[in-house]
């Protein structure tokens, strides 16, 4: 059973993965913890968020899905 929760986006960056592909990565802070999120499809992420300056996402509310005690996945911005 998966559960959706609200979270806050913190420390958003663009970087390179070990396979030389650019990614967006950030931390989501939830009521009882934090999780590092890595977004590989940057164009889709920009379209979904409508945000071209990634620093504008700092502090924004988002929805995450908790599929287990150790797996948390970004879903979308809270609208």
What are these regions (language model features)?
Residues 1-79:
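Short beta-rich binding modules
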């Amino acid at each position: 059973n998966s559960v959706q929760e609200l979270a806050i986006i913190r420390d958003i960056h663009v970087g390179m993965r070990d396979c030389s592909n650019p990614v967006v990565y950030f931390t989501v802070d939830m009521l009882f913890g934090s999780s590092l999120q890595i977004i590989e499809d940057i164009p889709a992420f920009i379209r979904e968020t409508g945000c071209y300056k990634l620093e504008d996402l700092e502090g924004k509310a988002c929805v995450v899905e908790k599929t287990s005690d150790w797996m948390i996945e970004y879903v979308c911005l809270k609208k």
